[in-house]
Regions:
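Bacterial N-terminal signal peptides that target proteins for export
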Residues: 31-40
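Conserved alpha-helical scaffold segments that buttress catalytic/binding sites
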Residues: 56-194, 199-489
């Protein structure tokens, strides 16, 4: 029997019944009654969890009578706004308008069932994935003990390529040399260590785990900057630091390991550049740097369509909560946090007010459309200049418009252009001392043209160029004379 049929056909029994007292043909109905009770309890929990997201929802006046005719339970479900956690508001209004009474009752019953399944129930759901608490290691891919490292080779970056300028073979970020241990970073006086974090466990979308290897394989990093004519790999000591291990069964265990590895990298003096992976890895990336430099000792510049400040969800570690967790745990200061490019369904009145209360300087696409990108970028630059000397730069590729980044895990329309984004990143990475960088949420399988990977590499390269321009002693917006004029009349 379909869920809607169960809900439509049930009638409350005159006295409490036990399944053992029922004939076989009535047991299904009795079990459905128990199911209804459970769903009503779960619905109540869902209402409490969704109060922030549905705070602005009210039933249109012309549909109020139709909703009242559905009965108390269905009416409460619709009026609470819990239904719009399952279907879009516009679709719900359409269904309330066009369906007859029986069809509408059946639909609402189905929505209540779905809503109940979405909520967390201690009786049905585990609070966490069971872990072996006696295990003393992160995973089977345990890092090589320090005592065994000297037996392999001398410390320092090394090449895995047969040719000096390889176009094939083992792919590395920008064709860079490889480093494996902190000793390699120290011996090579490495400026930037680029590491993959192939995690997509913290997102409802998949394939972000493929992004590090796809960005390596396309090999469009380390290109010369046409503005300053600086070649970042000639100015900086850059290495491919490999992929960090992730636990594909536990985001929590992955978060701890990534934070430890980022902290270890930062202690060598190299800038950890993380290539994700989903945006849940923003939290351990920033936490790892803070472990080394100190909490609230640096600013965070976050380019994204999403505020990542969900406070009412079932989970506490996901790609929708990284900024909330960083602020809640006091790892970063709200006054030193800047967000650019916000748009989409997560940008609501409740979230923006919360960000404002935390002191976060956010810039939505509404602001950019009203005032123009250059004016808003100027405001962002001033905010960065007034901020700490050190900055962590984070880029969720959803900041870009779908025309230039269709492979974003949580794609949103009407975003920034690639030239706008790289211009902003290049400037900030040249104007401030970058202590960490990460790019996340690229899902390569969504774009067979490779345009999204090309643009993701361009974003990473923009920060490398900015760091190289700063190390070269140039002003952030330095332009080489040859790049401006061919010298002929």
């Amino acid at each position: 029997m379909a869920p809607a049929q169960v809900w439509q056909n049930l009638r409350p029994p005159p006295v409490p019944l036990h399944s053992a007292d029922l004939p076989v043909e009535n047991m299904l109905v009795h079990e459905a009654m128990n199911g209804m009770a459970r769903y009503l309890v779960l619905f109540g929990l869902l209402v409490l969890a969704s109060q922030g997201a549905a705070a602005d929802w009210t039933v249109p006046g012309e549909l109020q009578a139709r909703v009242e005719a559905l009965g108390a339970a269905r009416r409460a479900f619709i009026e609470s706004g819990a239904a719009i956690q399952v279907v879009p508001e516009r679709q719900l209004i359409h269904e309330l308008t066009v369906r007859d009474e029986d069809e509408l009752a059946s639909l609402v019953d189905d929505l209540m069932v779905v809503a109940g399944e979405m909520g967390y129930s201690p009786e049905r759901d585990m609070g966490a994935a069971p872990l072996n608490l006696t295990s003393k290691r992160f995973s089977s891919a345990v890092t090589t003990p320090a005592a065994l490292r000297k037996m392999k080779r001398e410390a320092g970056p090394f090449s895995v390529h047969r040719y000096l300028n390889p176009r094939s073979g083992v792919p590395t970020f920008g064709g860079a040399k490889v480093a494996i241990w902190p000793e390699d970073l120290i011996a090579g006086k490495v400026d930037v260590a680029i590491m993959g974090v192939p995690s997509d466990m913290g997102s409802g979308q998949r394939d972000a785990a493929s992004a590090p290897d796809e960005m390596r394989a396309l090999n469009t990093i380390a290109t010369p900057d046409t503005q300053s004519l600086v070649r970042p790999f000639e100015v900086l000591a850059v290495v491919d630091y490999g992929n960090l291990e992730v636990d594909r069964m536990s985001v929590e265990r992955t978060v701890n390991h990534v934070a430890e590895m980022v902290a270890e990298t930062a202690r060598t003096g190299a800038v950890p550049m993380m290539v994700g992976g989903d945006t849940s890895m923003l939290y351990p990336g920033v936490k790892g740097v803070a472990t080394t430099l100190g909490e609230r000792s640096f600013g965070l510049l976050h380019f994204s369509a999403h505020p990542d400040a969900e406070r009412h969800g079932d989970h506490t570690i996901s790609d929708r909560q990284a900024i909330f967790r960083l602020l809640e745990d006091r790892i970063i200061d709200g006054g030193d946090t800047i967000q650019v490019g916000l748009r989409g369904p997560d940008v609501d009145q409740d979230t923006l007010q919360w960000l404002r209360d935390q002191g976060v300087r956010y810039h939505t696409m509404a602001e950019i459309r009203r005032h123009g990108f250059d004016k808003v970028l100027g405001r962002v630059r001033r905010e960065v200049e007034r901020g700490p000397n050190d900055f962590f730069v984070s880029v969720d590729v959803s900041a870009l418009a779908p025309a230039e980044m269709i492979a974003a895990g949580r794609v949103e329309a009407n975003g920034l252009g690639i030239e706008q984004l790289t211009k902003a990143i290049r400037h900030v990475c040249a104007a401030k001392n970058v202590v960490g960088f990460e790019i996340t949420d690229l899902a390569p399988m969504m774009d067979l043209s490779d345009l999204s990977v090309i643009n993701a590499n361009a974003v990473l390269n923009a920060c490398l160029v900015g760091i190289a321009v700063r190390k070269s002693g140039h002003e952030p917006d330095y332009v080489h004379p040859l790049a401006l004029d061919h010298g002929r009349r």
